[in-house]
């Protein structure tokens, strides 16, 4: 008998400042290859993608904003081990004042702002997929995107 297939629903949040730079965290979670990652995480039961995006932003970075989280796509990771659905969100901050904090030192070593044309590598797979779609590039292999109109 094959093992049960797990499903996961998450959200990835592109956070941009007034100067156009976007926020990425250096992810150092045990058992994973270190990579750069958007704020994000699991959607809790009964929670919308928008609510999850703002909650994860607050929990992971300490950034609290009244700006809306706009969902622009739903992405599906196509693997044999599990089904992963990621809501792609964007939050546009009004200024350049937000200073992210490392609130989960077992997951992130640091947060930094990057120009869109100079993103660091490697990117966390889900973040790579969200950013590719946002930049009008093809989705990475084993990902499928569904635009939200």
Could you tell me what each predicted segment is?
Residues 1-22, 42, 74, 87-92:
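Conserved N-terminal beta-strand and adjoining loop/helix that marks the start
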Residues 2-4, 26, 78, 101-102:
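Short, flexible, glycine/charge-rich loop motifs used to bind or transfer phosphoryl groups or to couple energy/partner
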Residues 7, 34, 83-85:
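Residue-level preference for beta-strand/loop junctions
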Residues 14, 28-29, 117:
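Anionic group-transfer/hydrolysis microenvironments
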Residues 21-59:
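Conserved Nudix-box catalytic region and its N-terminal flanking loop in Nudix hydrolases
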Residues 43-67, 76-133, 149:
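Unchanged
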Residues 136-149:
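Acidic/histidine-enriched, glycine/proline-rich intrinsically disordered or flexible terminal extensions
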């Amino acid at each position: 008998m094959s093992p049960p297939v797990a499903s996961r629903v998450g959200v990835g949040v592109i956070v941009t400042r007034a100067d156009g730079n976007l926020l990425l965290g250096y992810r150092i979670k045990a058992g994973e290859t270190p990579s750069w990652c958007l704020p994000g995480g699991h959607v809790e039961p009964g929670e919308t993608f928008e609510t999850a995006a703002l909650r994860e932003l607050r929990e992971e970075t300490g950034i609290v904003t009244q700006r809306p989280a706009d969902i622009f796509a739903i992405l599906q990771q196509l693997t044999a081990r599990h089904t992963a659905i990621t809501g792609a969100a964007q939050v546009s901050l009004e200024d350049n004042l937000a200073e992210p904090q490392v609130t989960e030192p077992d997951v992130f070593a640091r947060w930094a702002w990057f120009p869109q044309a100079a993103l660091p590598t490697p990117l966390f797979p889900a973040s790579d997929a969200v950013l590719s779609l946002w930049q009008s590039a093809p989705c990475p292999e084993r990902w499928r995107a569904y635009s939200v109109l």
